[in-house]
């Protein structure tokens, strides 16, 4: 059963992603083949061409059309004889008014074009990290994850446009190229690492949003639907997959991945009824095989359900605000973003024994949940609870399991420019079978996670301190992490950030694999 023992590390990776079904959120799998590599260059070029070619042409066309129209109007008056001037003088004022109206209409039209074409926002910068705890491998054929592990220039661009009075659209994209791999022997890194971490270009949010009726909002396209009231541990927030390639290093606004959905919001007084249909089946971006956040020694086949009408995911939410406190009910039927392991066959090898063949599958789950948020003075008390049904495991195949997730937390904002947040979450596997403790399932009846976040601003809110900590287990005995960062706004549009990430190994195999992943990081960002 040597293969089973090799698999323990891999299972612990998914054991950790079970906590990411709490999904650590204070923090389209892209296999960049030749086509997507071409997309990497096309996306920035497309936006540049809009600026360079389209905008000047549109403005020039507007100005030329306006000038030609004005000349045509005035030319008729230039041809008239002087003896007719007095007779026509009464019409001159009206003509002037017509010209003024046309100029106003043209100016308004030109302004609307400018707003539609020039309403861009985005950011550009460079993100770096340095792994100081890990030594370079003695074997030069192995990947070197010591020293500079990231030197990543990036660029993101968002175009927002208003379409009439009740509709608007958004198109956003993001691209990066990591120079750190070229600074080392790139041939020692796995193909999965290079394809997923060296470069990436993707379209993110692409949607059309509007209100066909006063009480109804419609949103169609790639989007993010965030459910729940928690800041760092997620319970009912199950619709969007997440980017977990660098565990603990990704912020909330970046961790959720937009996917193709249709969302309807219907308003009834203080209530909102939300209905969601997810058309695109896509799962978490996990650390690639061979990466410093993936300790597994073997690759497994992942079975991804086809995006079809039959596999459409659904969600319903009833959200209300009552005298200052908020409550919501949630229901969803979806594929679990975290795969389970299925034993597809067992081969008997003489001298070794039974060798199983593993495969990653995604269970079809049904979730019912509730959230509550109550302000009280300087405190905000919040809670989430959900029951998930339909969970599958490798070692117990004769039944489906359910799990109950509960979260409680509080935010305190009584200090000036300061926020303190504490959250505590438990995942309880119902009708637990002791067989599930063995590999490859490696399940626990109860998983416990606690997080604390402290944020404070200084120097007229231009310097921002952010401290985040998480511990696994009742007393942190299974591991944890600490992240510290300090951001300074050099000017309105330019900021720099520096910090450190420390991992606590504990008794959890996955956190033990991160013991030498401690690093310092730096980012410079220009926003426009």
Regions found by a protein language model. Give the residues of each.
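N-terminal periplasmic/intermembrane-space "pro-region" immediately following the signal or transit peptide
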Residues: 59-168, 172, 180-181, 195, ...
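Residues on the lipid-exposed face of transmembrane beta-strands in outer-membrane beta-barrel proteins
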Residues: 126, 153-161, 171, 205-210, ...
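Transmembrane beta-strands of outer-membrane beta-barrel pores
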Residues: 126-132, 175-179, 224-226, 268-270, ...
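Outer membrane beta-barrel
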Residues: 160, 165-294, 323, 503-505
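Detector for outer-membrane/organellar transmembrane beta-barrel domains
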Residues: 162, 373-393, 397-471
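Repeated loop/turn-to-beta-strand initiation elements of outer-membrane beta-barrel proteins
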Residues: 166-169, 215-218, 270-273, 324-327, ...
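Outer-membrane beta-barrel "beta-signal"
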Residues: 244, 502, 516-528
């Amino acid at each position: 059963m040597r293969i089973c023992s090799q698999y323990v590390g891999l299972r612990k990776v998914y054991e950790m992603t079970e906590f990411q079904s709490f999904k650590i959120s204070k923090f389209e799998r892209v296999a960049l083949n030749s086509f997507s590599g071409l997309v990497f260059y096309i996306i920035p070029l497309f936006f540049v061409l809009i600026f360079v070619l389209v905008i000047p042409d549109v403005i020039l066309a507007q100005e030329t059309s306006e000038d030609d129209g004005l000349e045509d109007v005035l030319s008729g008056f230039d041809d008239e004889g002087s003896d007719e001037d007095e007779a026509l003088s009464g019409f001159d004022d009206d003509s002037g008014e017509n010209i003024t109206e046309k100029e106003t209409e043209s100016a308004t039209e030109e302004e609307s074009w400018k707003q539609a074409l020039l309403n861009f926002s985005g950011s550009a910068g460079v993100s770096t990290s340095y792994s100081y705890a890990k030594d370079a491998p003695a074997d030069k054929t192995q990947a070197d994850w010591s020293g500079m592990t990231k030197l990543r220039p990036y660029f993101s661009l968002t175009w927002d446009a208003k379409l009439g009075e009740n509709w608007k659209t958004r198109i956003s994209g993001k691209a990066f190229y990591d120079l750190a791999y070229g600074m080392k022997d790139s041939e020692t890194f796995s193909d999965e690492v290079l394809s997923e971490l060296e470069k990436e270009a993707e379209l993110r949010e692409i949607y059309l949003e509007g209100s066909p009726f006063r009480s109804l909002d419609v949103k169609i396209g790639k989007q993010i639907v965030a459910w729940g009231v928690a800041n760092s541990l997620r319970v009912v927030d199950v619709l969007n997959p997440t980017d977990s390639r660098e565990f603990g290093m990704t912020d909330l606004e970046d961790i959720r991945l937009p996917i193709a959905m249709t969302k309807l919001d219907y308003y009834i007084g203080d209530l909102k009824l939300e209905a969601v249909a997810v058309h695109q089946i896509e799962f978490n971006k996990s650390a690639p095989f061979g990466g410093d956040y993936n300790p597994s020694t073997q690759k497994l086949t992942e079975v991804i359900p086809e995006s079809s009408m039959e596999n459409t995911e659904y969600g319903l939410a009833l959200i209300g605000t009552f005298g200052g406190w908020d409550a919501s009910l949630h229901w969803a039927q979806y594929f679990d973003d975290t795969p389970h392991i299925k034993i597809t066959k067992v081969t008997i090898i003489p001298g070794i024994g039974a060798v199983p063949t593993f495969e990653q599958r995604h269970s079809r789950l049904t979730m019912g949940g509730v959230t509550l948020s109550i302000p009280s003075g300087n405190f905000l008390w919040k809670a989430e609870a959900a029951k998930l049904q339909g969970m599958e495991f490798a070692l117990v195949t004769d039944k489906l399991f359910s799990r109950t997730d509960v979260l409680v937390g509080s935010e305190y904002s009584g200090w000036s420019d300061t926020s303190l947040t504490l959250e505590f979450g438990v995942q309880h596997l119902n009708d637990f079978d002791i067989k599930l403790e063995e590999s490859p399932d490696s399940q626990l009846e109860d998983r416990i996670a606690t997080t604390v976040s402290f944020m404070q601003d200084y120097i007229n809110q231009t310097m921002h301190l952010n401290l985040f900590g998480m511990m696994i287990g009742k007393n942190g005995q299974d591991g944890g992490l600490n992240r510290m960062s300090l951001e300074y706004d050099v000017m309105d549009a330019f900021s720099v950030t520096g910090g450190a990430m420390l991992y606590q190994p504990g008794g959890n195999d996955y956190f033990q694999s991160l013991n030498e992943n401690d690093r310092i990081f730096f980012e410079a960002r220009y926003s426009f």
